[in-house]
């Protein structure tokens, strides 16, 4: 028996234990990624003394997500790993997730990229979001849509992308992009709210 598949099946069996827990995990696995989007918008829009650093963090995290997603897309084209619910009829895909490439877990990968940046820049709430990213990752196994190694692969790609961004000229590009994005968003909000 494949240990990766066995773990998914055992975790997924817990869906029959508690309806409330299953509903909670369903909400996390389907909509949990929105927590990162909302947090990013709050970081960008909130007033305060460290606004420039918060906005730079948002841009770096966004660049990381874009690069990691491109890598994930390329991996999925080269190697289409079947999802756990495709390989074992006992695994219940209660989210209705489509049967596309399983490796890596994009939710885990993108959550890890964002959290790495938040922790690196000491953003408020970063530790709480790190815990939530872990819960989101676990929910993907619980839902029967990913293997543990999909999660590990996602975190590994996130780490590589994080190193790439901070080890190349991308960090300076992010600074220029932050300045431009700040000017545009500030102008838009001034225009909207001064009318």
Question: What would you call each of these model-derived segments?
Answer:
Residues 1-101, 109-136:
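Hydrophobic alpha-helical bundle signature of multipass membrane enzymes
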């Amino acid at each position: 028996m494949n240990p990766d598949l066995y773990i998914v099946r055992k975790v997924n069996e817990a869906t029959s234990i508690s309806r409330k827990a299953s509903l909670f995990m369903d909400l996390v696995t389907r909509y949990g990624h929105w927590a990162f989007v909302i947090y990013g918008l709050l970081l960008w829009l909130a007033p305060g003394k460290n606004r420039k650093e918060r906005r730079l963090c948002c841009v770096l995290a966004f660049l990381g997500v874009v690069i990691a997603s491109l890598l994930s897309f390329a991996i999925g084209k080269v190697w289409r790993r079947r999802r756990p619910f495709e390989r074992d009829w006992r695994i219940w895909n209660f989210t209705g997730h489509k049967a596309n490439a399983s490796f890596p877990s994009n939710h885990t990968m993108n959550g890890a990229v964002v959290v790495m940046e938040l922790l690196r820049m000491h953003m408020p709430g970063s530790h709480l979001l790190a815990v939530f990213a872990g819960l989101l990752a676990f929910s993907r196994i619980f839902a029967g849509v990913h293997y543990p190694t999909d999660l590990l692969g996602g975190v590994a790609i996130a780490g590589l992308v994080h190193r790439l961004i901070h080890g190349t000229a991308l960090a300076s590009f992010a600074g220029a992009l932050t300045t431009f994005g700040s000017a545009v968003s500030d102008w838009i909000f001034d225009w909207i709210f001064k009318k």
